[in-house]
UniProtKB/Swiss-Prot annotation:
Keywords: Cobalt, Magnesium, Manganese, Transferase
Positions of the Pyruvate carboxyltransferase domain: 4-275
Cofactor requirements of the protein: Mn(2+)
Organism domain of life: Bacteria
Organism the protein comes from: Dehalococcoides mccartyi (strain CBDB1)
Broad class of enzyme this protein falls into: transferase
Name used for this protein in its record: Citrate (Re)-synthase
Alphabetized Gene3D superfamilies for the sequence: 1.10.238.260, Aldolase class I
Similarity-based family: Belongs to the alpha-IPM synthase/homocitrate synthase family.
The keyword Manganese is annotated on this UniProt entry: yes
Catalytic activity: oxaloacetate + acetyl-CoA + H2O = citrate + CoA + H(+)
Length: 415
């Protein structure tokens, strides 16, 4: 029976959300946290985008060093040969790609304005997949953008063409959140059965159904006899009304009535890391976690009603489906109310040594070497426009050369 694999797209779909964004260091921490959590793959960036170059190379280097241990790092590009060539010119060690192209009649007509028809879409995709493998890619996913508004006949043709040239999986993109759990189940199952390859499910929340659709889509693919790869973002942050939330989707798999008995993850996930990554993403994006967010919202384990409070005190399972400890919650958050020394863009070496010492991190005794780390911290503060968290400071101290690459943005660098 097929399994469920998580491909988190926070560092692609999440960061392209209007009015939001992450620094390259913050994106790197997200990858590290996803790896710690046991997530299968991160769509970690745009290898053709010039300002992503240092970040992409640095994260691939972290994977090579074993800092990122098991998480696959996959780049997103358009399904055109020019993008494939540019991606591998800028990131020669890239091994995993997703190639995206519009498949619906609406988008083909609306975007290309008569310059392309559906057969051109298939031709562009197949040529791009072949080019990616020729450049050294190990896995290539093919994205059918606006799949939920594409006819099933065309989707099957598109998927079979992708399979014929060796694509690893077909991404079914409910780009506008148009599907519902009933329609996506039937479509996903049909694609799995008729195309005969793993299907990736990518859902948006425009109608409030990203989690339900992801769950139903996963069920459909597995019932159709294939592995399923489900896209998530941390805290559901994504374009317009967002994507399927990572933690909520995991809870739906693991905790909903009867689902996990038959439909299981293909990789071990450490749910106790959920609170850590959700809280960091909230701080990094500067978007507060909704008070009622499943698993990580402030009210998720809060009780005021007399009947509920009495019941949960007697036995938490009376009114809680799962324990807060399972998500890594429960620690007391300490907030300094007295004197505090901070590390910022204008910090000096004395104060910086004090800050790092409080985290049990010893800086080099050599003043010049210590100042090099301090300078990186200053630049990181400038880029983030807010104080760095402890893990960011520790990362910079531990990996100064990688940090330098993350912080180096050169608009006019040669390809």
């Amino acid at each position: 029976m097929g399994k469920i694999f998580i491909i988190d797209v926070t560092n692609r779909d999440g960061v392209q959300t209007a009015r939001l964004g992450l620094s390259k260091l913050e994106k790197t921490l997200i990858n590290i946290y996803l790896d710690e959590m046991g997530i299968f793959q991160s769509e970690f960036g745009f290898p053709t985008t010039k300002h992503e170059r240092g970040y992409v190379e640095a994260n691939l280097e972290l994977a090579k060093m074993g800092v990122i241990k098991n998480l696959r790092l996959e780049g997103w590009i358009r399904a055109i040969v020019a993008d494939v060539d540019l991606a591998f010119r800028r990131a020669p060690s890239l091994k995993h790609l997703n190639l995206s192209i519009s498949t619906s009649e609406q988008m083909i007509n609306g975007k290309f304005q008569g310059r392309k028809v559906f057969k051109d879409i298939i031709e562009d995709m197949t040529i791009a997949v072949n080019a990616a493998y020729a450049k050294g890619a190990e896995t290539v996913g093919v994205n059918a953008e606006d799949a939920s508004r594409t006819s099933i006949v065309n989707l099957i043709e598109f998927g079979k063409a992708a399979k014929e040239v060796g694509a690893t999986r077909l991404r079914y993109c409910d780009t506008l959140g148009y599907d519902n759990p009933f329609t996506i189940y039937e479509t996903a199952r049909t694609l799995a059965e008729k195309v005969g390859m793993p299907i990736e499910i990518h859902c948006h929340g425009d109608l409030g159904m990203a989690i339900g659709n992801s769950l139903a889509g996963a069920k459909g693919v597995i019932d159709g006899g294939q592995d399923v790869y489900v896209n998530t973002t941390v805290n559901g942050i994504g374009e317009r009304a967002g994507n399927a939330d990572l933690v909520a989707f995991l809870l739906a798999i693991l905790k909903s009535k009867g689902f996990g008995e038959k439909y299981q993850l293909g990789h071990e996930v450490d749910l106790s890391k959920a609170w850590k990554i959700a809280r960091f993403a909230s701080y990094a994006f500067d978007v507060e976690i909704p008070i009622n967010q499943p698993g990580v919202g402030r009210n998720c384990f809060a009780h005021a009603s007399g009947i509920h409070a009495d019941g949960v005190i007697k036995d938490s399972q009376n009114y809680e489906l799962y324990g807060y400890e399972e998500l890594g919650r429960g620690e007391a958050l300490m907030v300094e109310t007295g004197r505090e020394i901070c590390a910022g863009q204008y910090s000096g070496i004395s104060g910086f040594r004090h800050v790092m010492g409080n985290m049990s991190v010893e800086l080099p005794e050599d003043k010049d070497e210590a100042n090099k780390i301090l300078e990186l911290v200053r630049y990181a503060n400038v880029e983030a426009h807010k104080p760095l968290v402890e893990d960011e400071l520790i990362f910079i101290a531990k990996y100064p050369e990688i940090s330098r690459r993350l912080l180096t943005l050169t608009p006019l660098m040669n390809d």
